Amino acid sequence: MSEDFYDVLGVSRDASKDQIKNAYRKKAAKYHPDVSDEEDAEEKFKKVQKAKEVLTDDEKRQMYDQLGHERFQQAQKRGAGGGGGGRGQGNPFGGGGNPFGGMGGGGFEDIFNNLFNGGGGQRRSRPQQGRDVAQRITIDLEDAYHGVERDVTIRRREVCPECDGEGHPADADVNTCSECNGSGQQTTVQQTPFGRVQQTTTCRACGGEGKTYSEDCSECRGSGRVRRTRDVTITIPAGFRDGQRLRYRGEGEPGENGGPNGDLFVEVNVRDHEEFDRDGDDLQYTHPISFPQAVFGATVEVPTLDGEAELKVPAGTQSGSTFTVSGAGMPHLDGRGNGDLHVEIHVVTPEDLNSEQREALKQFAEAGGEEVKESLFQKLKNSL
């Protein structure tokens, strides 16, 4: 992958911000370490993130276009360290004499603070929290009703067990870094469109340690991290809704420089049910009854996610009428009761009638003043 940020995203140098963002989304989806099987996916993903960060920031992009890739990267390499230094420390943009100060947020002062970090001495690496890990799981509505435990397999970076995260064998020879003479820093003078700027950066050869080792760990190749899979037990509480997420602190990737682990986020998807439709914590259900039950009324049993429930259907009930079974819906997440079950009645019109049934319906129609014709039964069907 090319180092140039425009090449990394595959866009032209006059690309709009929207084009850059669209290109970033495609590249990020391709190289995300949780998705891609490429060995260098993580490195490519970081390059894509960095390219997007710079090219969608108007001021950083302007600096990048002016300085070029190499100069811009040198200016940003892990910061120049220390703050507070003024012109006397070699940074013409530091201290109270900063000619670009007082311009408000986002001015040139911010640019040089971001790029050169004030210019002065060494800046110690701060503890950083590890990356979060995302996972998705699908459950049935019955599982969401009762609550359930599931094991999910996650893939994440972990501290290398071979070298305990050091990146080298315990018996490796230790040498003073020849690049920085053991200081852990390198000082360079950078020519910018605004003049010469002195930079003190973390030594790339030793990573700021001031020492190097005779060999790298054979397991992690010096990175101190290895990619592993592990099972995590997920507890989904009763009443969980489709699309909600669970957070498990510390189950993500290990932190850097003593920082805490990242977190694990699990998105729960709930499958559609064959009989019930969910609306928040309420459930919708359609229940069929016979024509006589609709006429005379009846007590019927309707299914719920926790067994059967009795429902009284009053005489003269029409198709489409809705009745409520209180507390027969989904549990509330706070544990305080349940939603309701709303039952829509569907009156089933008989299709095949024997002679007695047909005669009874004719008498029913005549008693109601209906003219008995061949279309009577169809009319009854349409009226129900």
Swiss-Prot record:
Bias-annotated ranges (Gly residues): 79-105
Keywords assigned: Chaperone, Cytoplasm, DNA replication, Metal-binding, Repeat, Stress response, Zinc, Zinc-finger
Localization, UniProt: Cytoplasm
Ranges occupied by CXXCXGXG motif repeats: 160-167, 177-184, 203-210, 217-224
Chain sites annotated for binding Zn(2+) 1: 160, 163, 217, 220
Binding site for Zn(2+) 2: 177, 180, 203, 206
Cofactor annotation: Zn(2+)
Start and end residues of each stretch annotated as Disordered: 74-105, 113-132
Residue intervals of the J domain: 4-68
Gene3D superfamilies documented for this protein: DnaJ domain (1.10.287.110), Heat shock protein DnaJ, cysteine-rich domain (2.10.230.10), Urease metallochaperone UreE, N-terminal domain (2.60.260.20)
Any GO molecular function: zinc ion binding
Similarity annotation: Belongs to the DnaJ family.
Subunit comment: Homodimer.
PANTHER family with a match to the protein in the record: DNAJ HOMOLOG 1, MITOCHONDRIAL-RELATED
Protein name in UniProt: Chaperone protein DnaJ
